[in-house]
């Protein structure tokens, strides 16, 4: 059963910061680390990012930037990365990421997603009402 959880989100290829965060979370003796996606599109190294996440067995979901990279969409965004710059293993890792991960925790079921449920672009703001499950 998972008790203490470390959360990472919107990595955006920041491999140095990701490594630092994973190291800090390891020092905190968390039971699991989860990542809300968006590994792609940033100034750092996407290869080092996906390898670090996989190596640390981080529960990771796909974000909209990961989907955009795989589908070759919105490549006009700042610091966009392209499929040609990602290894076959890296592309396979990104393609394997689910939209939703469910984990049993000491506090009950945790549902991890990038947006809301399977909509990676959905946002929640104060006052927003939703029926997403």
Residue ranges and their predicted role:
Residues 2-96:
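Core catalytic region of metal-dependent phosphoesterases/phosphodiesterases
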Residues 1-12, 31, 103-110, 115-118:
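Mobile, glycine- and charge-enriched loop segments
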Residues 80-133:
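Acidic, His/Gly-enriched loop-helix segments that form or flank divalent-metal centers
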